[in-house]
Amino acid sequence: MLISELTKNTDCRIIGSDCDISRIEYDSRKLTGGELFCCIRGTFKDGHEFAESAVARGAAALLVERELPLSVPQIIVKNSRHAMAELAIEFYGHPLDGIPVIGITGTNGKTTTTYMIKAIAEKAGYKVGLIGTIRNLIGDRIIPTDRTTPESVELQRVFR
């Protein structure tokens, strides 16, 4: 997908030429070439620190909060984590449009509650997906996860 298509609904400034993006990624170790690398500020690390290595690993463009002295196109936004979520929705074609979603929060009982709701919905004839800390399920298909709280990009990939 071209950067111009990807960013059509995002408040941003684009530096550099329009290019094709093969995937959206925020972990520089997972780059294979052609991706948009999202520089996300975290509690302990700032993804901007990995931008140079991401470009060396084949990132086609960067999502950043400030312009970096690198020769690839850059999408500059106020909040890269928020923009990554918007771009993932666009990239994966708005996969949740028209699909009911139930979110469960709290300290205790979330896993039990989700599996109870899943069982009830399936008995009622609905096809059910479940995103949880243990695993992700879409119908009978198990989708492994390595994070207890998936990032927006993983969620959109699973929803697709």
Region locations from a protein language model:
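N-terminal leader/targeting and accessory segments in enzymes
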Residues: 1-86, 90
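Phosphate-binding loop of NTP-binding sites
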Residues: 10, 84-160
